[in-house]
Swiss-Prot record:
It comes from Helicobacter pylori (strain J99 / ATCC 700824) (Campylobacter pylori J99). PANTHER family: L-FUCOSE-PROTON SYMPORTER (PTHR43702), PROTEIN TSGA (PTHR43702:SF3). Belongs to the major facilitator superfamily. FHS transporter (TC 2.A.1.7) family. The chain crosses the membrane at residues 11-31, 47-67, 70-90, 96-116, 139-159, 180-200, 225-245, 263-283, 300-320, 321-341, 349-369, 378-398. It comes from the Bacteria. One of its GO terms (molecular function) is galactose transmembrane transporter activity. This is Putative glucose/galactose transporter. It is found in: Cell inner membrane. CDD domains: MFS_FucP_like. Its main location: membrane.
């Protein structure tokens, strides 16, 4: 009976990961959409990612403690409700035409995603004893399905409802801002429906079913966890930085409009989806850390080629990085939380805080891009910022993942 419950739980969690990916990737549509509406610089536009991923740092530890008390199943329900609230706030934000309101709504929405992330990832690993990395990669493939469909959804329902002229009136800009209202209202309704479904399913609280430990080391005494949390920081920062500026790079270097450029995001995030489905199969034969090292090295090579070669080849190389990003988050997470026992929920909260890399790295790249724009230099040099992130991931895959003998 327990095995059936665990299988049902894993299956239902695919909806959670799908929604997280779908909503998160819409930020890559919001940046080029809101930039001309509010006359933003690259740095100001990147504040969308700062507010969204900043919520991970502020709320990750909070939800880690909350979920350790209420359990993973109720943590999932709570996450969906908060997410729905944030999505609904996009309606008044667009109505008043306030960029600050948009950022506030994004923070609340992101807080819901943080709660889902904090509950969902360890939930999967605890349901998958002996197959933690493989099953988390498989379930997160549905996260990538969401990130693949998100740009299509966003470009059709948001960009198609906007005007393309560079000299829009204030009224036209407000009308363009309102194009996000119905899509996000729909996401709010969908989130509430998922909250109801998860509540009615009565998922098993696997952590409470684990035997209590008489002694417990400090979470931060586990070096593999500390290195892993930093790995998540740099992975999310690098991935989000590339995704955030990919559309703007295509616009600038290939003279494509925003809607056409957004289609390339499908290849970036779609590559991650393909890589995760493939990775879940290959991890039966390849050690997770070795697979991670190969993908990190491949990403380094692709970004370096993009910077050195430039042109169409560079942008296609950056797009292909998405494929190698595929297994990084679930693999780093599973390696970092391995054998942590009852510290797992708190560890997940700290790792959720580490996702703040997505808030800090893109603005750094934004500042570098603004500097390069001012001096009319090659914008691709700014991709040196995410390049450095992948070097750390390579370190974690080769050495940082190792547990101490007495862990």
């Amino acid at each position: 009976m327990q095995k059936t419950s665990n299988t049902l739980a894993l299956g239902s969690l695919t909806a959670l990961f799908f929604l997280m990916g779908f909503i998160t990737v819409l930020n890559d549509i919001l940046i080029p959409h809101l930039k001309p509406i509010f006359d933003l610089t690259y740095f100001e536009a990147s504040l969308i990612q700062f507010c969204f991923f900043g919520a991970y740092f502020i709320m990750g530890g909070v939800f880690g403690n909350v979920i350790s008390k209420i359990g993973y199943p109720f943590g999932v329900v709570l996450g969906f409700v908060i997410t729905a609230s944030g999505c609904a706030l996009f309606y008044p934000a667009a109505h008043f035409g306030s960029y600050g309101f948009f950022l506030g709504a994004l923070f609340i929405l992101a807080s819901g995603i943080v709660c889902l992330q904090t509950a969902g990832n360890p939930f999967v690993t605890l349901l998958s004893k002996g197959k933690e990395a493989r099953n988390l990669v498989l379930v997160q493939a549905f996260n990538s399905l969401g990130t693949t469909l998100g740009p299509i959804f966003g470009s059709l329902l948001i960009f198609s409802a906007t005007k393309t002229s560079d000299n829009l009136s204030l009224i036209d800009k407000l009308a363009d801002a309102k194009s996000v209202q119905m899509p996000y209202l729909g996401l709010a309704v969908f989130s509430l429906l998922l909250a109801l479904v998860m509540y009615l399913l009565k998922l098993p609280d696997v952590e409470k079913e684990m035997p209590k430990e008489t002694t417990q080391k400090s979470l931060f005494s586990h070096k593999h966890f500390v290195f892993g949390a930093l790995g998540i920081f740099f992975y999310v920062g690098g991935e989000v930085a590339i995704g955030s500026f990919l559309v703007l790079s295509f616009e600038k270097l290939l003279n494509l409009d925003a809607q056409s450029s957004a289609h390339y995001l499908v290849y970036y995030w779609g590559g991650a989806m393909v890589g995760r489905f493939l990775g879940s199969a290959l991890m039966n034969k390849i050690a997770p850390n070795k697979y991670l090292a190969f993908n990190a090295l491949s990403s380094i090579i692709l970004i370096a080629l993009a910077i050195l070669i430039g042109g169409k080849i560079a942008l296609f190389a950056l797009t292909f990085v998405g494929f190698f990003n595929s297994i990084m988050f679930p693999t780093i997470f599973s390696l970092a939380t391995l054998n942590l026992g009852h510290l797992t929920s708190k560890a997940s909260g700290v790792i959720s805080m580490a996702i703040v890399g997505g808030a800090l790295i893109p603005p750094i790249q934004g500042v570098v891009t603004d500097m390069l724009t001012a001096t009319e230099s090659n914008l691709l040099y700014a991709y040196s910022v995410p390049l450095l992130c992948y070097f750390y991931i390579l370190f974690f895959a080769l050495k940082g993942y190792k547990q101490e003998e007495n862990s």
